[in-house]
């Protein structure tokens, strides 16, 4: 088919090409010739329109059969000769043949376009013919015209065929018309059909569109309805879900509350059980104590009676001595008062004389002033006259040259010379007059100055007289004022004209004499004031030290005279050299004379036999002028006024320190050079002004005491030697307690060796710090993978709604918690931001803070931060990034002021990026993955370092960290301690949970401030000696391999500062005597293995060390105290900082910590221990170290200090006795005179002293405190003195009571004890009667004691047996009642009321009955048994064994059931049980409603537990019958009555075993009902367990029914097909279910929990965290 189409197309193209080539010339000729013929034919063409020619028909047929023609043409051969010949013939003849037309028509395409083309051709032909017919004349012209190629071939007709052409045209016209008509009809028909079809199509389209629209509307309605239904369904589902969630939350909350309540109940039960066991132990101890006290009381009474009989004459003698001494003291006091009165009168007389002198001087001064005024007026008048005369002369001499002529020039010159000569003469006379007047004025001024000086001295003397009670500060202030006045008065003298130098030289001797007199008066006044003040403060030393005080004051006065003269005449050096030389000569002469006189006097005073230590008091006074306690005034030196003022200020500051807080390290202050250091002088002056006065009271320190008192000198030497020997013996005993002791010299040498080694090898901190500050920071580009920022930015409105800010630029604080996730791009606008806290906000990076330049505090804990960008935040101080995902330390470049950085719980492997952190002090990187710490060398300022719980095998980079104070390295893989050769400030070192096997590295380190050392849970088998750690207080070496006790003692030897020691988990604890050995080695130990020790020595640490180490130790203690006080000053809640003020305080704390660390490091490097002596004294002011009050220990300490003081000479070492508080001489005499009293008092300390004796002792102490002899001792009396005073007071009260008892023995008929022994103080006058009654009284006492011992022992044994039985039967606690702990506590007084009061006339005060115990005659019907074999009562067993049902009853019912005996007996068992059941059911229902229990058994169990845990109220002391009834807990309640007669009648039934038949019936019924109820309860439990196993999981969980079930429960998960747990959990289900455990099982559970809670090696968590069971979390 395709081939035919191609051939047809080719043929058509060839035909048209040939037709176009045909020549038209022949056609034109034929047209011209046949014009006429064509006209005729055109005329006849109209008629022939209806006839169609064959060609037209042929065309029509061809059109109709075009398909056939096309097929024929396709099949026709292209080379057919006939067709082409016919075609040529037709062309030659000029006619168009049918074949041509056939070809023309056949060449048209089959489409409609070919038909239209044919119609156009025919129409063109028709128009041509029609035009020819209309214009025949134009034919010729048209023929000659050039035929265009566009002209169709059919228009040209040849002349030979004219006829044929006419017919052809007509037929063709007719055919055309008919064809047009037919075509029009066809077109109309087609249009009609088309219109109908279009209309039908429109209708169909419209219907289809309508249907489509309906369909779309239906779909929309369907969608709307569907959506509506879905919304309704969703709402219903949401409501249902919300309700379900709410119900689930409510049930979960109820479930949690129920679990928590049950857990609390279980914990309370456990606590009650432990408390029960503790109370039982306490009860045992109390009973043992009661027996011990009774035995002690009996022994004390017996010994007291024996002692009284033996020592009664000695006591009388001592009482007489005491009276005589009291009388002597009164006489001394009277003498002292008399002397004081005389001194007062003398001072008043002197004051009166001075006042008279003052009045005379005032009158003289006024007279001189009047004379001065008169002379002044006269001089003024004379001066005015001279001035007027001089003016007149000058005027005359000025006019004289004008009158003289020029001829008389010589005479004129001579006249001028004379005039000039007259003028100087007048000036000279005026100068002389002025000089005379000035000299007179100077004389008057000198007189006035002298008057002023005298007035000032008188005023100052009066002021000093008024302030005689003031010690050092007012006297120094007066001296300074005197010096200021004298200097102010000497200043005008320097401004006097040089012309008056001679007059001054003439007046100088008189001024010197006057000044010397003033100085003498001033010194005398000061010395008198000092003497009076000393006498007022120490009246007991008034008569003893008057002579020495006067001598020493005279010595100081003479020295002051020379110094004052030097100061008063020092200004003469400025006037002239001669005057200065004369003044120096005078000063030297006066000094030499005074020195000679002082030496002569002192040699004469000390010429007698004296000790070697007193041979050089002058040298001691020169080197240590303030050691003499009788001279409170400082020795004046030639220093400036500013230095004096500084000294005064320092002395004032030191005077504020309380007198109890003086340290023993003050001896080191005294050892310093007093002539150089002003601080030392101030301290010594203060100590000399009254603080060291008690040091002279001992009386046994003559070797070191510079000024011994008269009483000590007069006392016999034998007593002194005995006291010294006793002190040496006590010291030897105290020193002999320690084994393997290390001498002080050894400790000193080893400590000093380590310190010197450190001094030689340490790197100066200043150099390290300077290098760190000036190092160049090289910025390294670190490729940190930042997570894509896909989170939304922080909402600005959320930031602004929490404050009064209007824009983000004003926001200073941002705090959020728990945000879903955000980015920090919003914070770029917060330029004023200072605090940023975003916890649990889902942050992945810390970026966008570059514009927050004022940011100080960042808290981004508990996020997912992986990248940090906080560059160039210079104000940033604290950054908290705990619990994130960091893998390295980065992003802090330019944060130069960052001080605290916390990065715990991250994934950091190495420490780096700390180059720019020049002030970093706290770095926390615990719980990371660290394997190296080399980056720490970039931050040498670190103070606190926490690298715990990492993977470290060694610590590097801390060599330059010279300020490190706390290092935490627990939970790593360390094999040895880190190198600490440059860390003198280290205070805490934590090395727990490592693999350390040796600590040899610590032996060579100098760590003077190390307080806490923890090496627990390691592999230590040996430890180095630790005595070189002078400040070590806490040591933990638990869970190691220490096994040798002797080595342990050697390691801990000489560790005098150690207070807490933990050795748990070591094999050494298996030794028998390890505890005693440790306590002997460490007498100051207070806590051993977590247990507080009651008996520990409270000695000072400095006492155990050598004197050369005490200053160093004081420095260390001071620095430690400063470090401990600094956090308390600034920080209260360090990690809850959300205010700007708190952040500023934290920053200031870090700054002060850095400053203090610098100072302490500098002090250690320079070896300057004197810089903190005054501060140490101030520190001890706030923290005084009170010693133990035990008298024996205090005596040991006192004697030891005395002997140590005797060993040192005062010239080579400081006297430690200056800081030891010693008793006064009067007390020393009493102690020496009462040796026997002390022995007896020591024996009687163990006995009990009655309340009267205690009140008497306190009264005596108050009286002694108010007396003038002890005014200065109230604040500074040491504990030994106080202990001695208490012992003496108690001994005196004991003697007074014995005297009272002796007087009471005179009247044995009196049965009531004396209420006031002081009133009834009578002497024994009838000894014979006392001796006869003594035997009878002793027999009575023995009988009474025997009876009491038998009865109390029986009761105690009975109670203990019952308690043991109850404890053994605890496992079956459902059947027995709990043990009432208060039943063990019986009132001794109430029991003793049953016994008559013994006749205590022959007993001392210890056996007297109490004041509230009235004597009661013994009733013969009380006991119904033999004295040798007492019968055991049967009924007391009811006190512990009772009906089980009564245990469930509440306390209210117990109170309601207390009624009379008759009412109880009238009750029947049925009514009793029904009443109990009624109350029980009401109580159970109430509890079930309140707690929401579904099962009544839970309420029953709760009631039982509440009954067991209920604390009983304290019972009042009732009558004996009621007391005994409550004690027995019998079912028959005894009525509470106040009648004494009824109680007397009931005493008959105390010890009778009586059981009535009614009681037996009640017991049988109660047992039957109890068994029945028990069976029903067990059946109910079984039924409940079986029906709740396959129920709802919430209802059947182990926690919910923990208190209800009694059988082992099944897990609901197991019933639902879950897995069965084959491996037990950390805490099994039975451990938490405490209802099934008895007391023994509970104790086993606690042991198991303790074992499980022990920390394991290489644990990931901190050892300080608490462990909880999985069910309880």
Curated annotation (Swiss-Prot):
Residue span, IQ domain: 291-320, 1280-1309, 1340-1369
Start-end of Polar residues biased regions: 603-629, 1168-1226, 1308-1325
Protein name from the UniProt record: Leucine-rich repeat- and IQ domain-containing protein 1
PROSITE patterns, per database record: IQ, LRR
Region (Disordered): 22-48, 189-208, 324-374, 544-658, 679-702, 1163-1230, 1308-1330
Any single biological process term in GO: single fertilization
Species in which this protein is naturally found: Mus musculus
This protein's UniProt keywords: Leucine-rich repeat, Repeat
Cited Pfam families: IQ, LRR_8
Taxonomic lineage from the root: Eukaryota, Metazoa, Chordata, Craniata, Vertebrata
PANTHER family: LEUCINE-RICH REPEAT AND IQ DOMAIN-CONTAINING PROTEIN 1, LEUCINE-RICH REPEAT AND IQ DOMAIN-CONTAINING PROTEIN 1-RELATED
LRR repeat residue intervals: 34-59, 216-239, 491-516, 641-665, 830-852, 853-873, 874-894, 895-919, 921-939, 940-961, 962-983, 984-1005, 1007-1029, 1030-1054, 1067-1090, 1378-1405
Database matches in InterPro entries: IQ_motif_EF-hand-BS (IPR000048), Leu-rich_rpt (IPR001611), Leu-rich_rpt_typical-subtyp (IPR003591), LRR_dom_sf (IPR032675), SDS22/Internalin_LRR (IPR050836)
Keyword Repeat carried by entry: yes
Biased composition (Basic and acidic residues): 326-374, 549-567, 588-602, 647-656
Signal peptide, first to last residue: none
């Amino acid at each position: 088919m395709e081939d035919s189409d191609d051939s047809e197309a080719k043929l058509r193209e060839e035909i048209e090409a040939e037709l176009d080539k045909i020549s038209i010339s022949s056609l034109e000729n034929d047209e011209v010739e046949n014009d006429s013929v064509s006209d005729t034919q055109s005329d006849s063409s109209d008629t022939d329109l209806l006839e169609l020619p064959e060609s037209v028909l042929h065309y029509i047929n061809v059109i109709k059969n075009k398909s056939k023609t096309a097929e024929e043409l396709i099949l026709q051969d292209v080379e057919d000769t006939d067709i082409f010949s016919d075609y040529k013939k037709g062309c030659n003849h000029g006619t168009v043949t049918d074949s041509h037309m056939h070809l023309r028509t056949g060449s048209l395409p089959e489409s409609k376009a070919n038909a239209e083309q044919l119609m156009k051709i025919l129409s063109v032909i028709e128009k041509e013919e029609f035009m020819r017919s209309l214009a025949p004349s134009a034919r010729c012209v048209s023929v000659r015209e050039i035929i265009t190629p566009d002209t169709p071939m059919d228009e040209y007709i040849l002349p030979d065929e004219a006829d044929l052409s006419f017919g052809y045209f007509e037929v063709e016209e007719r055919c055309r018309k008919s064809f047009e008509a037919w075509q029009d009809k066809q077109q109309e028909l087609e249009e009609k059909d088309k219109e109908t079809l279009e209309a039908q199509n429109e209708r169909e389209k419209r219907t289809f569109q309508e249907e489509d629209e309906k369909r779309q509307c239906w779909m929309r309605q369907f969608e709307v309805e569907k959506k509506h239904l879905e919304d309704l369904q969703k709402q219903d589902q949401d409501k249902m879900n919300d309700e379900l969630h709410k119900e689930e939350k409510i049930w979960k909350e109820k479930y949690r509350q129920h679990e928590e309540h049950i857990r609390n109940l279980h914990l309370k039960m456990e606590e009650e059980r432990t408390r029960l066991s503790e109370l039982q132990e306490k009860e045992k101890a109390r009973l043992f104590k009661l027996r011990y006290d009774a035995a002690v009381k009996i022994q004390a009474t017996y010994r007291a009676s024996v002692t009284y009989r033996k020592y009664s004459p000695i006591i009388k003698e001592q009482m007489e001595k005491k009276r005589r001494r009291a009388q002597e003291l009164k006489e001394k006091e009277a003498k002292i008062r008399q002397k004081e009165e005389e001194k007062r009168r003398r001072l008043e007389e002197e004051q009166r004389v001075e006042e008279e002198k003052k009045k005379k001087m005032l009158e003289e001064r006024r007279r001189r002033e009047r004379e001065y005024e008169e002379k002044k007026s006269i001089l003024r008048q004379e001066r005015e006259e001279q001035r007027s005369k001089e003016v007149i002369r000058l005027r005359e001499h000025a006019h004289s040259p004008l009158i003289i002529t020029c001829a008389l020039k010589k005479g004129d010159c001579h006249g001028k010379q004379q005039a000039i000569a007259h003028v100087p003469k007048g000036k000279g006379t005026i100068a002389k007059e002025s000089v005379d007047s000035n000299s007179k004025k100077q004389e008057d001024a000198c007189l006035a100055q002298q008057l002023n000086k005298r007035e000032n001295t008188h005023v100052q003397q009066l002021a000093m007289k008024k302030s005689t009670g003031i010690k050092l500060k007012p006297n120094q202030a007066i001296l300074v004022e005197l010096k200021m006045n004298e200097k102010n008065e000497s200043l005008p003298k320097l401004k006097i004209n040089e012309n008056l130098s001679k007059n001054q030289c003439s007046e100088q001797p008189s001024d010197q004499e006057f000044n010397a007199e003033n100085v003498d008066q001033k010194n005398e006044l000061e010395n008198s004031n000092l003497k009076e003040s000393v006498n007022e403060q120490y009246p007991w030393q008034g008569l003893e030290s008057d002579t020495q005080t006067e001598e020493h004051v005279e010595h100081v006065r003479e020295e002051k005279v020379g110094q004052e003269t030097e100061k008063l005449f020092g200004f003469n050096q400025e006037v002239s050299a001669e005057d200065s030389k004369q003044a120096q000569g005078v000063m030297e002469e006066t000094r030499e004379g005074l020195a000679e006189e002082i030496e002569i006097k002192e040699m004469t005073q000390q010429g007698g036999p004296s000790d070697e230590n007193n041979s050089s008091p002058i040298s001691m006074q020169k080197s240590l002028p303030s050691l003499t306690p009788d001279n409170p005034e400082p020795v004046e030196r030639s220093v400036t006024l500013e230095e004096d003022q500084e000294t005064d200020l320092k002395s004032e500051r030191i005077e504020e320190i309380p007198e109890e807080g003086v340290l023993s390290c003050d001896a080191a202050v005294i050892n310093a050079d007093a002539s150089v250091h002003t601080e030392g002088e101030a301290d010594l002056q203060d100590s000399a002004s009254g603080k060291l006065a008690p040091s002279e009271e001992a009386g046994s320190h003559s070797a070191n005491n510079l000024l011994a008192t008269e009483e000590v000198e007069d006392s016999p030497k034998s007593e002194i030697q005995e006291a010294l020997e006793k002190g040496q013996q006590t010291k030897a005993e105290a020193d002999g307690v320690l084994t393997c002791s290390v001498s002080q010299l050894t400790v000193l040498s080893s400590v000093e060796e380590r310190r010197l080694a450190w001094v030689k090898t340490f790197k100066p901190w200043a150099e390290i710090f300077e290098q760190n500050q000036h190092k160049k920071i090289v910025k390294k580009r670190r490729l940190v993978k930042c997570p894509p920022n896909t989170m939304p930015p922080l909402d600005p409105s959320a930031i602004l709604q929490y404050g009064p800010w209007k824009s983000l630029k004003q926001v200073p604080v941002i705090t959020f918690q728990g945000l879903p996730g955000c980015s920090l791009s919003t914070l770029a606008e917060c330029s004023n931001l200072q605090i940023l806290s975003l916890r649990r906000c889902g942050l992945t990076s810390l970026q966008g803070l570059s514009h927050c330049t004022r940011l100080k505090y960042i808290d981004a804990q508990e996020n997912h931060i992986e990248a940090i960008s906080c560059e160039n935040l210079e104000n940033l101080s604290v950054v908290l990034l705990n619990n994130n995902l960091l893998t390295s330390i980065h992003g802090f470049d330019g944060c130069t002021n960052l001080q605290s950085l916390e990065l715990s719980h991250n994934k950091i492997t190495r420490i780096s990026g700390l180059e720019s952190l020049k002030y970093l002090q706290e770095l926390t990187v615990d719980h990371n993955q660290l394997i190296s710490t080399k980056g720490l060398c970039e931050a040498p300022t670190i103070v606190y370092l926490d690298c715990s719980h990492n993977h470290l095998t060694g610590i590097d980079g801390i060599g330059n960290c010279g300020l490190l104070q706390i290092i935490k390295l627990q939970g790593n893989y360390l094999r040895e301690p880190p190198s600490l050769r440059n860390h003198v400030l280290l205070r805490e070192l934590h090395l727990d949970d490592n693999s350390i096997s040796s600590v040899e590295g610590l032996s060579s380190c100098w760590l003077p401030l190390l307080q806490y050392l923890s090496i627990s849970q390691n592999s230590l088998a040996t430890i180095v000696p630790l005595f070189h750690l002078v400040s070590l207080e806490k040591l933990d070496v638990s869970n190691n391999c220490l096994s040798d006790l002797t080595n342990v003692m050697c390691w801990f030897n000489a560790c005098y500062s150690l207070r807490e020691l933990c050795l748990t988990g070591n094999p050494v604890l298996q030794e028998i005597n390890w505890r005693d050995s440790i306590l002997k080695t460490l007498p100051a130990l207070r806590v051993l293995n977590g247990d507080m020790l009651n008996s520990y020595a409270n000695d000072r640490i400095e006492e155990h060390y050598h004197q050369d180490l005490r200053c160093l130790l004081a420095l260390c203690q001071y620095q430690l105290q400063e470090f401990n006080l600094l956090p308390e000053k600034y920080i209260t809640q360090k990690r809850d900082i959300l205010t700007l003020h708190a952040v500023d305080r934290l920053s200031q704390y870090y700054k002060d910590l850095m400053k203090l660390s610098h100072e302490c490091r500098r002090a250690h490097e320079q070896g300057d221990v004197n810089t903190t002596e005054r501060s140490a004294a101030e520190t001890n002011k706030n923290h005084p170290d009170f010693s133990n009050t035990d008298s024996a220990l205090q005596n040991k300490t006192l004697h030891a200090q005395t002997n140590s003081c005797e060993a040192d000479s005062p010239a080579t070492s400081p006297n430690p006795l200056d800081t030891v508080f010693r008793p006064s001489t009067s007390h020393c005499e009493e102690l020496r005179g009462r040796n026997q009293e002390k022995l007896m008092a020591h024996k009687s300390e163990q006995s009990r002293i009655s309340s009267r004796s205690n009140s008497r002792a306190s009264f005596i102490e108050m009286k002694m405190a108010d007396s003038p002899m002890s005014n200065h001792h109230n604040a500074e009396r040491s504990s030994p003195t106080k202990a001695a005073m208490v012992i003496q007071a108690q001994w005196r009260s004991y003697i007074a009571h014995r005297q009272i008892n002796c007087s009471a023995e005179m009247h044995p008929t009196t049965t009531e004890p004396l209420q006031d022994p002081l009133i009834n103080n009578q002497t024994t006058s009838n000894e014979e009667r006392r001796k006869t009654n003594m035997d009878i009284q002793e027999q009575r006492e023995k009988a009474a004691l025997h009876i009491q011992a038998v009865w109390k022992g029986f009761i105690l044994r009975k109670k203990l047996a019952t308690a043991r039985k109850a404890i053994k039967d605890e496992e079956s606690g459902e059947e027995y009642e709990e043990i009432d702990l208060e039943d063990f506590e019986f009132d001794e007084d109430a029991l003793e009321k049953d016994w008559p009061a013994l006749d205590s006339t022959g007993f001392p005060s210890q056996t007297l009955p109490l004041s509230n115990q009235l004597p009661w005659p013994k009733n013969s019907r009380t006991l119904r048994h033999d004295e040798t074999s007492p019968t055991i009562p049967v009924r007391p067993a009811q006190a512990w064994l009772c009906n089980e049902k009564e245990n469930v009853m509440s306390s209210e019912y117990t109170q309601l059931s207390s009624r009379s005996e008759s009412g109880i007996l009238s009750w029947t068992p049925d009514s009793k049980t029904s009443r109990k059941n009624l109350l029980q059911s009401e109580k159970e229902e109430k509890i079930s409603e309140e707690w929401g229990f579904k099962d009544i058994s839970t309420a029953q169990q709760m009631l039982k537990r509440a009954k067991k845990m209920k604390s009983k109220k304290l019972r009042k002391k009732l009558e004996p019958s009621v007391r005994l009834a409550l004690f027995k807990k019998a079912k028959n309640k005894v009525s509470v009555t106040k009648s004494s007669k009824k109680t007397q009648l009931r005493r008959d039934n105390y010890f009778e075993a009586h059981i009535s038949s009614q009681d037996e019936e009640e017991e049988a019924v109660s047992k039957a009902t109890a068994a029945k109820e028990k069976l029903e309860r067990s059946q109910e439990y079984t039924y409940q367990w079986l029906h709740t196993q396959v129920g709802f999981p919430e209802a059947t969980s182990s926690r919910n029914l923990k208190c209800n079930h009694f059988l082992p429960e099944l897990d609901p998960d197991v019933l639902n097909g879950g897995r069965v747990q084959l491996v037990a959990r950390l805490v099994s289900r039975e451990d938490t279910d405490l209802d099934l455990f008895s007391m023994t099982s509970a104790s086993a559970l606690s042991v198991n929990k303790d074992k499980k809670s022990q920390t394991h090696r290489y644990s990931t968590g901190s050892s300080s965290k608490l462990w909880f069971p999985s069910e309880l979390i």
